[in-house]
Amino acid sequence: NDAVSARRIIKRYVSGIGEARIRDIESPDSRQAGLKLTDFMDLKIFEAEPYAALLEGLEENNVIVYDVESTGTDTANDNIIQIAAMRIDKPGGEVKKFERFIKPEKSVGTSEAVHHFSDEDLAEIGEDPKVVLQDFVEFSRDAIIVGHNVSYDVSILTSELARHNLGKPAFKGVYDTLDIFRRFYPNLPNHKLGTLSETFPIDHQPTHNAWDDILATALLLVYVVEENIKPTEAKRMALINSYKGAFSGIASQMSTLRRKAQK
C-alpha cells in the first residue's frame, strides 16, 4: 500500500511531521481538494499546480482522450488491436478523431469476450501495426493524454512502440480519470468506468469498445474538472504551500531515486 509506505518513510526520515500532521493531510478537507499523502513525496507537486497542465490543455484544445483494446492484459507480450483517441474542446466535444484497428501478431483468444472482435474481424479490418502506431505517435505528439486506468494503455503502447523500433510516446502529460475520481469520490463502491457513467450525469455509457469508452471518459473528465478540480484549486494550492517546507527535502530525495531507477 503506497499510503502505508509513505507514512513509514515520513515518520522515519522527515522531521517535524508527526501523526497529527499526517492525519491533517489525510483529512476530508485535503481529500476534497484532491490530495493524497503520497503526493507530497513527489517534487513535482511543489513546482506547479497538479492540474495546471490539464486545464491549460483544455483551454487550448490540446487534450486527447485515449483508450486501447488488446489481446490481453500483459502489457509486455499482448498486442493492441484497436486505438481510439479524440482531441476534445473545453466542453468535451470532438475536435479531431483517431480510430484504427490493428492486425495482431497473436490470436485474440479469450479477450474476444471482452471487446467482441474476432481474429477474422481483425484480419479484415486491421492494418499493419507499425503504420497505425506511427500515425498515433504523430496524432498525439505534445498533447495532454487522458484515459481511464490510463497507465495500462500507456504501458502497452510503450511496449508496442519499442517492439517496432518506433521510440517512445511523445506526450506532454498524462492524467488518469480513475485516479482523479478515486481522489474526489473515495466512498463510491468502485470506480469502474461503467459505475461512474451510471453515477454521474453523463449521457454516454462505456461498452468495452475503445471508442465508446473514450466518449464516456471525455464527459466524465469535463464533469470532474468543472465540479471538483476548478472549484478546489485555491484550497489545493494553499495546502501544498503549507506543507512545502516540511516535505520538499524528502520529495527531492525521492525524485532523485526515481530518476536513478528509470535509467
Describe each model-derived feature in a short phrase.
Residues 1-4, 41-54, 153-155, 189-193:
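Short, motif-level signal for alpha-helix interfacial/capping segments enriched in acidic residues
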Residues 2-31:
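Helix-hairpin-helix
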Residues 6-8, 19-22, 141-151, 156-161, ...:
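Acidic, Mg2+-coordinating catalytic module of metal-dependent nucleases/exonucleases
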Residues 59-172, 186-208:
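Conserved non-catalytic scaffold segment of RNase H-like nuclease domains
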Residues 70-72, 179, 216:
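Short, glycine/acidic-enriched loop or turn micro-motifs at the edges of active sites
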Residues 171-181:
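A short, structured active-site edge motif that brings together acidic residues
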